[in-house]
Amino acid sequence: MAGPPASLSARDVGSFAYLSVKDRSPQILTKAIDTLHRHKSEFFEKHGEKGLEAEKKAISLLSKLRNELQTDKPIVPLVEKFVDTDIWNQYLEYQQSLLNESDGKPRWFLSPWLFVECYMYRRIHEAIIQSPPIDDFDIFKEFKDQNFFESQESIIALCTHLQELRKTIEDLDENQLKNEFFKVLQISLWGNKCDLSLSGGEHISQKTNIMNSLEDLKPFILVNDMDRLWSLLSNCKKTREKESVTRVDIVLDNSGFELITDLVLADFLLSSKLATKIHFYGKTIPWFVSDTTLHDFNWIIKQLKHSNNKWVSQCGVDWEDHVKTGRWVYLDHIFWTLPHEFSAMSQVAPDLHAALQKAHLIFFKGDLNYRKLTGDRRWEFTVPFHEALSGFHPAPLCSIRTLKAEVQVGLQPGQGEQLTASEPNWLTAGKYGVFQFDGPL
C-alpha cells in the first residue's frame, strides 16, 4: 500500500509554501524586531540597563534567525533548555534522517513547510527566553490587542445577539434551536478570517457586523457537516442522564475577534444545553502571531467585563463565572506548539490524547490545526477527511477552518478543479470555509 503523499514544502518554487518562507516569514521576523525597538524605553523603565542589553540581545538573535532563513542555512538545534527542547531536537534529527541531500541537513527551503514554520516561531520564543529580564515579553501581544480594539462594532453586535438569544432560548422549538446553532457555528467559522500570521502581522480586524453577512457567505462553505454536528449534540442532550456531562472541546486558533466568536459558540452550547462543559485548548507560548495563550484568554474576558456596553459587559461577567464554576476550563499543552502532525499525538503526548478521548466532540479551529490534522500533505482534493487524518480519531471531531494553505480534502469530484480554474488562489485567500466532521455516521 502506498504511503501518504509528500509534505508541502518551499522546494516547490512559486507555491504558497515557497512564497510564505521567502516573503511572509522574514516580514514577520522584521515586525518582531521592530516591536522590540519600539518597547526599548519600556524595557529601560522596568529593568534599567539590563533591559536595554536584553533588548539588544533579542534583536541580535532574531536578526541572525532572519539571515539563516533568507540564506537557506541548515536548521540548527535549539540551545536554550526549555520543557520541549529535547522533543524539538529529536524531531530535527528525525527530519535529518529523511533527507538524502548532499549534506543531509534540513533547510528552510527544502524541509516540510509545517516543520520550518513552527520552528521559526519556536526560535522567536527562544530568542526572548535567552534574553532575561525581558524573557516573559509577548512579542505579538500588541498585534492581538489591536485586532480586538479594531473589531469593537462586531463584538458589540455579537454580544448583543447572544444576550438577546439567551432570554428566549428556553422557548425555542427544536428547529429554531438548530438554526441558532448553525448561526453561531458560522460566526465562529468566519471569525477565523482574522489571522495575523497570514497577513505577515499586518492589521486584520472584523469591522463590519458579521451577523448581517451569514446568508451571503453560505455559498463559500465548501464542506458543510453542520447537520452531523447537530445530530450528535442533540442526541447527547436527549439521552443525557441528569447528573452526567456532555463535554465539547475547542482547540483554539486566533485571539482577538476570533476568540470572541469561539466564546460565543461555547456560551451557546451551555445555554442551549447541547453541552454542559467546555474545555478550551490554547498555546503555552506566543505562536503564529495571533494564536491564543492563557494571558490572551483571561485578558479578553476582562476587557469585555469592563466594557461600557451593557451586553458586552454582561458577556464578560457571564464568561468569568463560567471559568470560576468550572463549566469552562482553559488548558494548554506543549504538544500544540510542537511541529508534529496530530497523528503522532498518541506517541508524543499520550496524556493529551487520553484527555481528548473523554470529549463528546472536539472542534479544531483554523488553518494550522487543519494542516496538522492532515499532515500538511499534497492530498488529492477528493481523499476522504477520515483517511487524511492518518489514524487520529480520539473522539468525534470537526475542523472549522477558512482556507489559507494549499491543502484541502473531502471535496466532491471536480469541485477543486473547478475552483482552481475560476479562482487560482481559492486555497489560500481565506474566502472559502469548511465544517469537516469525522465521527460515527
UniProtKB/Swiss-Prot annotation:
Catalytic activity, as annotated: beta-D-fructose 1-phosphate + H2O = D-fructose + phosphate; beta-D-fructose 6-phosphate = dihydroxyacetone + D-glyceraldehyde 3-phosphate; L-glutamyl-[protein] + S-adenosyl-L-methionine = [protein]-L-glutamate 5-O-methyl ester + S-adenosyl-L-homocysteine
Residues reported to bind substrate: D253, N254, D367, L368, N369, Y370, R371, K404
EC number: 3.1.3.-, 2.1.1.-
Residue positions, PTM Phosphoserine: S102
A GO BP annotation: DNA damage response
Motif (Subfamily III RTxK motif): 401-404
Binding site for S-adenosyl-L-methionine: E258, D291
The keyword Lipid metabolism belongs to this UniProt entry's keyword annotation: no
Keyword entries, A-Z: Acetylation, DNA damage, Hydrolase, Manganese, Metal-binding, Methyltransferase, Nickel, Phosphoprotein, S-adenosyl-L-methionine, Transferase
In-chain residues carrying the UniProt-annotated modification N-acetylalanine: A2
Post-translational modification: Automethylated.
Molecular function per GO: fructose 6-phosphate aldolase activity; fructose-1-phosphatase activity; metal ion binding; phosphatase activity; protein carboxyl O-methyltransferase activity; protein-glutamate O-methyltransferase activity; S-adenosylmethionine-dependent methyltransferase activity
Modification sites for N6-acetyllysine: K40
Obligatory cofactor(s): Mn(2+); Ni(2+)
Residues binding Mn(2+): D253, N254, D291
Free-text function comment from the UniProt entry: Metal-dependent phosphatase that shows phosphatase activity against several substrates, including fructose-1-phosphate and fructose-6-phosphate. Its preference for fructose-1-phosphate, a strong glycating agent that causes DNA damage rather than a canonical yeast metabolite, suggests a damage-control function in hexose phosphate metabolism. Has also been shown to have O-methyltransferase activity that methylates glutamate residues of target proteins to form gamma-glutamyl methyl ester residues. Possibly methylates PCNA, suggesting it is involved in the DNA damage response.
Family of the protein in this entry: Belongs to the damage-control phosphatase family. Sugar phosphate phosphatase III subfamily.
Domain writeup: Subfamily III proteins have a conserved RTxK motif about 40-50 residues from the C-terminus; the threonine may be replaced by serine or cysteine.
Protein name per Swiss-Prot or TrEMBL: Damage-control phosphatase ARMT1
Name of the encoding gene: ARMT1
